[in-house]
From Swiss-Prot:
Record protein name field: tRNA N6-adenosine threonylcarbamoyltransferase, mitochondrial
Taxonomic lineage of the native organism: Eukaryota, Metazoa, Chordata, Craniata, Vertebrata
Catalysed reaction equations from the record: L-threonylcarbamoyladenylate + adenosine(37) in tRNA = N(6)-L-threonylcarbamoyladenosine(37) in tRNA + AMP + H(+)
GO molecular function ontology, one term from the record: N(6)-L-threonylcarbamoyladenine synthase activity
Gene Ontology terms describing biological process: tRNA threonylcarbamoyladenosine modification
UniProt binding sites for substrate: L157, V158, S159, G160, G161, D190, G210, E214, S317, N318, T345
Cystine pairings recorded for this chain: none
Keyword Mitochondrion: yes
Presequence positions on this chain: 1-27
Organism expressing this protein natively: Danio rerio (Zebrafish)
UniProt KW keywords: Acyltransferase, Metal-binding, Mitochondrion, Transferase, Transit peptide, tRNA processing
Length: 404
């Protein structure tokens, strides 16, 4: 946990950080946890004054996945430009900033290091407070920038690197209800897309793996293949996608032999496999989320008025998965909120907003002279997954069908 500065260290800049002046405080957010170099300037109302984002997606599509050394090099080449663009678009000088917020955990070590090194040099040069940010906390709280939402609320975070369920009780207080035991949902969808050679598909050349699956699934028959939803007899909220990917890979291998398809060619049923894969991933996410809702209700952890499920992270951009989750929230009386797709994927805006949240409450604000380290692995909140498992809540069956 990050320690706030001692009063003596705060003296030189506390007036600006904790000022009651009517002039809005401004935070520069910097994101480099994986393969997006992002920066944004926000005021304390959540107004985006300027932002910039450099995506490495096209490079990593060509290499078949994220190579940490390549990601590091691209962050190094682009971070100065991206930050300067965000400042220029906001018409804000560094001297006008109240603080700088940067992702320091979790993520790829080499990527985190670029963002942290740049940020520490920046805050020392301009003598600005530094706010270290937990990447998953930022995803969880992004929706509060767009909607008036009080704590507590349930959060499902699904991306290429993470799949977890947590109860958000405060800006830095979370209860971890479930997490992936192997690979994340987004990683699974990306690997299935690579196995299907969707990079070469005429409809999918510029899309990420998950986006390609979603695109083709719209014209596929999800009932053409039956994949077993993982962990059906495990009454907890953890996720597991590796076994599902093995099932799907087996089906692809079988069909390739039947059709005589060689590597790089497409199966005639590629859209059906995409649809069935997407549905099974969505179903697994939905069932674990359903149990998390029932657990939270049984323990009185959700408010009676306007209980809410937030879905964020890159996979939350998938409209089909959102629709399946809406079936669960409708059945359990929860309100479903998802950030716009542009804020589901990694960006500087969510980091700046998390900095604003911390600034308002005076939490985790460090002096520019303090030493900070990045953490490639970092849990989210207090782990109560064993308590969830002990509750052994059985989830009633629901028909997970959509109109699309």
């Amino acid at each position: 946990m990050f320690q706030s500065c001692l009063p003596g260290a705060l003296r030189s800049w506390s007036r600006g950080v904790f000022s009651t002046s009517t002039r809005p405080r401004l935070v520069l957010g910097i994101e480099t946890s994986c393969d997006e170099t992002g920066a944004a300037v926000l005021d304390e109302t959540g107004r985006i004054l300027g932002e910039s984002l450099h995506s490495q997606k096209e490079t990593h599509l060509k290499t078949g996945g994220i190579i940490p050394l390549v990601a590091q090099r691209l962050h190094r080449e682009n971070i100065s430009r991206v930050v300067q663009e965000a400042l220029n678009r906001s018409a804000i000088e560094p001297s006008e900033l109240t603080a700088v917020a940067t992702t320091v955990k979790p993520g790829l070590a080499l990527s985190l290091g670029i963002g942290l090194d740049y940020s520490l040099k920046f805050v020392r040069q301009h003598q600005k407070p530094f706010i270290p940010i937990h990447h998953m906390e930022a995803h969880a709280l992004t929706v509060r920038m767009l909607h008036p939402l009080d704590f507590p609320f349930l959060v499902l975070l699904v991306s290429g690197g993470h799949s977890l369920l947590a109860l958000a009780k405060g800006i830095d207080e979370f209860l971890l209800l479930g997490q992936t035991l192997d690979e994340a949902a987004g990683d699974t969808l990306d690997k299935i897309a690579r196995r299907l050679s969707l990079r070469n598909h005429p409809e999918c050349g510029t899309l990420s793996g998950g986006q390609a699956i979603e695109r083709l699934a719209k014209e596929g028959d999800r009932l053409a293949f039956h994949f077993i939803s993982p962990m059906g007899q495990n009454y907890d909220c953890n996720f597991s996608f590796a076994g599902l990917r093995t099932q799907i890979t087996g089906a692809i291998n079988k069909k390739e032999k039947e059709e005589g398809v060689e590597a790089g060619q497409f199966l005639s049923c590629v859209k059906d496999i995409a649809a069935a894969s997407q549905h099974t991933v969505a179903s697994h996410l939905a069932k674990r989320t359903h149990r998390a809702i029932l657990f939270c209700k049984s323990k009185g952890l959700l408010p009676e008025q306007n209980p809410t499920l937030i879905v964020s992270g890159g996979v939350a951009s998938n409209e089909y998965i959102r629709q399946i989750l809406k079936i669960i929230t409708d059945a359990t009386g929860l309100h479903l909120l998802c950030p716009p797709s542009k804020f589901c994927t990694d960006n500087g805006v969510m980091i700046a907003w998390n900095g604003i949240e911390r600034l308002k409450q005076g939490k985790g604000i460090l002096s520019y002279s303090e030493e900070v380290s990045y953490e490639p692995k970092a849990p989210l909140g207090l782990d109560i997954t064993s308590e969830v498992k002990e509750a052994a809540i059985k989830v009633p069956k629901l028909k997970l069908r959509t109109n699309s």
